[in-house]
C-alpha cells in the first residue's frame, strides 16, 4: 500500500547551499524530517546548478520519511541572470532597467517548459515576456 502524505513543504533554496540553519532547518524540523539527510541529498542533486534559486516541494509521509521534487528556477531569477542585473525595477511602468532579446526569452521558456502550464513554446514565451515587463525589462527582437 502507498504511504500516506502527511504534509507538503515548499521552499526556495539556493542550489547546493542547503544548510540546517534558518530558514531550511525550522521548516523541516516542524515537519519532523531528518534535516541533515535532506540537506545532503538536495545539495548533491543541485550541485550542477550553482548560483540559482531552486524551488523544492517536499512530501512528508506519516512515518516521517520524505521525498522531494526540484523545480526549475523562477522566471524572474533566469531573466535577471540573462539581463545581467541584480534586481528588477521598482516602478516597471516608468523606469526600464534592462533589455532582453526574444532569443533569450525563448531559451528561458524552454528551460521553464516542464513547470509552466503552457501548451506550446509560443505561449510559454508570452508568459516569460509578461514576467519580464512586470520587472521593468524591455523585450526586443
Swiss-Prot record:
Upper lineage: Bacteria, Bacillati, Bacillota, Bacilli, Lactobacillales
SUPFAM superfamilies: Ribosomal L11/L12e N-terminal domain (SSF54747), Ribosomal protein L11, C-terminal domain (SSF46906)
The protein, known as: Large ribosomal subunit protein uL11
Keywords: Methylation, Ribonucleoprotein, Ribosomal protein, RNA-binding, rRNA-binding
Organism annotation: Streptococcus pneumoniae (strain Hungary19A-6)
Protein family: Belongs to the universal ribosomal protein uL11 family.
UniProt xrefs under InterPro entries: Ribosomal_uL11, Ribosomal_uL11_bac-typ, Ribosomal_uL11_C, Ribosomal_uL11_C_sf, Ribosomal_uL11_CS, Ribosomal_uL11_N, Ribosomal_uL11_N_sf
BP-aspect Gene Ontology terms: translation
An annotated Gene Ontology molecular function: structural constituent of ribosome
Subunit structure: Part of the ribosomal stalk of the 50S ribosomal subunit. Interacts with L10 and the large rRNA to form the base of the stalk. L10 forms an elongated spine to which L12 dimers bind in a sequential fashion forming a multimeric L10(L12)X complex.
Gene3D superfamilies noted in UniProt: Ribosomal protein L11, C-terminal domain, Ribosomal protein L11/L12, N-terminal domain
Biological function: Forms part of the ribosomal stalk which helps the ribosome interact with GTP-bound translation factors.
Post-translational modification note: One or more lysine residues are methylated.
PANTHER family linked: 60S RIBOSOMAL PROTEIN L12, LARGE RIBOSOMAL SUBUNIT PROTEIN UL11M
Superkingdom of origin: Bacteria
GO cellular component, one term: cytosolic large ribosomal subunit
Amino acid at each position: 500500500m502507498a504511504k500516506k502524505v502527511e504534509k507538503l513543504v515548499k521552499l526556495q533554496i539556493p542550489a547546493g547551499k542547503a544548510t540546517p540553519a534558518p530558514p531550511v532547518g525550522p521548516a523541516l524540523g516542524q515537519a519532523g524530517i531528518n534535516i541533515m539527510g535532506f540537506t545532503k541529498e538536495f545539495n548533491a542533486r543541485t550541485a550542477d546548478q550553482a548560483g540559482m534559486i531552486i524551488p523544492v516541494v517536499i512530501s512528508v509521509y506519516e512515518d516521517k520519511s520524505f521525498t522531494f521534487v526540484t523545480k526549475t528556477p523562477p522566471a524572474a531569477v533566469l531573466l535577471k541572470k540573462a539581463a545581467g542585473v541584480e534586481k528588477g525595477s521598482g516602478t516597471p511602468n516608468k523606469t526600464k532597467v534592462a533589455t532582453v532579446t526574444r532569443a533569450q526569452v525563448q531559451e528561458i521558456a524552454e528551460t521553464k517548459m516542464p513547470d509552466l502550464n503552457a501548451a506550446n513554446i509560443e505561449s510559454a514565451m508570452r508568459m516569460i515576456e509578461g514576467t519580464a515587463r512586470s520587472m521593468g525589462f524591455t523585450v526586443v527582437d
